[in-house]
Amino acid sequence: MRHGFLVAGLAAALMLTSCGGKDDVQGKTGEDITAKSSASDIGEAYINEMTRIADALETVDDEASAKAAAKKIQVAVDGLNQMSEELDGEISGVKGMQIFGGRYAELVQVQGRIATSMIRIQSDHPELMDTISAEMDRMEN
C-alpha cells in the first residue's frame, strides 16, 4: 500500500525540485538553477531530472538493475531537491504556468513514464520496490 502512495505522491511531487551531474543529461539540470533562472531554464532542468528518473526506472528488472537505477535516481532526486531549495520550494501558480505551460505535453509524458514504470515494478518485481523507494522517498514536495 505504501508503494501505491509513492506513485500518487510522485505525481503530486511534480511541483518542483532538481540537480545532479550532467553525465547523462543534455541541457539544463538542477545544479544549473538559481533563484534568478528563467522559467524556461527551470522547466528544462525539471523535465531533464524527471526524465533521468523515468529512464532509470524503465531499466529495472532484477536486483542489479534496481541498484543501478537507484544510483541514477539518487542523482536526479538530489538535483530536484537542490533546485527546490534554491527556489525556496515555492512556485506561484503564475510562475508554474510560465515554467510548464509550453512544456505541458513533455511534463505529462514523463509523469506517465514514471507512473507506468512504478506500477510495472510493483506488479512484476515487488521485492525491488524497497531499493527504488529508498531514493524516491527522498524527493521533497
Predicted segments, located by residue:
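Classic N-terminal secretory signal peptides
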Residues: 7-13
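C-terminal motif of bacterial Sec signal peptides marking the signal peptidase cleavage site
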Residues: 15-18
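Immediate post-signal-peptide N-terminus of mature secreted/exported proteins
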Residues: 23-74, 138-141
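Intrinsic-disorder-associated interaction segments
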Residues: 5, 32-39, 66-69, 73-76, ...
